[in-house]
Amino acid sequence: MRTTMTARARRVLVATAGSLLAIAMVGAVTASASTTTTTTRSSGSPIKLATKYASGLRMAMDATYPPDEFVQNGHIVGFDADLGMALGKVLGVKVTLVDATFDTIIPGIQDGKFDVGNSSFTDTKAREKVVDFIDYFKAGEGFYEQANSTKTFNGLKALCGHSVAVETGTTEQADAQSQAKLCKVNVLSYADQNQVNLAVSDGRADLGFADSQVAAYIVHLSDGQFKLTGTPFETAPYGFAVAKGSGLAAPLLAAVKAVMASGQYKKILDKWGVEQGAISDPTLNGATS
């Protein structure tokens, strides 16, 4: 989860039946890179948007985090990108997705450079002091294993007596190592997600441990090689960030509700294999910690 002001870029590579399927992720895209989609208002009651936004919304994201937002063939893609486009359609305005370094997005919203932050922001009480959040998704940490495994893992205590593969430098590595101080856990740390997946596929590790939506995406692209096990834990809401007093919070919340009601929300999450993080009741500033 992106709980700090530093983006945690990942290379997500999935091992499949003797070959590797790479999920494209370009980490060296300039902050000025953007993709623009012109939308028209969907049918139904119009959502009022301040006149100053009639020309469109600049939506900032750090496109280094598949499956949420990443660059593929020169365009920003991912479920966050798709949701942003869907919101533009409901609001009837042009949406420009702007690739920006993660820790510049909230300051950019505050100084008017960006209208919306859409970059897997965990909604926290600390962040709510400076921006408003429209919560639309939940994410945490999750496990995945070989599809033919008969074991079920729920929560950190389930790691006891098992080998778990993690990516070096992640929250999951820290959590697994903390659990290893309480019981016997063989923590296998690797430099990238590809090596983590290989450790699970060849049986060195009983399970892989990653952010819940990343784990879901790995399974989604594994061609039946992996499956999720247990339920996500340490979950927290993701939110679209807007400046306080911008007049965007209420219309964006209404737009999120409309996208959900239309079924488009479910279609987008299903497309990216992250339906496990779906919520049914979007809220304004719903942080719990």
Indicate residue ranges for each PLM-predicted region.
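Acidic, polar ligand-binding/catalytic clefts
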Residues: 94-158
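A ligand-binding cleft/hinge motif common to bilobed small-molecule-binding domains
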Residues: 103-104, 120-128, 177-178, 201-234
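Extracytoplasmic small-molecule ligand-binding "clamshell" domains
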Residues: 41-120
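Periplasmic-binding protein-like
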Residues: 63, 138-145, 216, 220-257, ...
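Bilobed "Venus flytrap"/periplasmic-binding protein-like clamshell domains
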Residues: 63-66, 76-89, 121, 142-197, ...
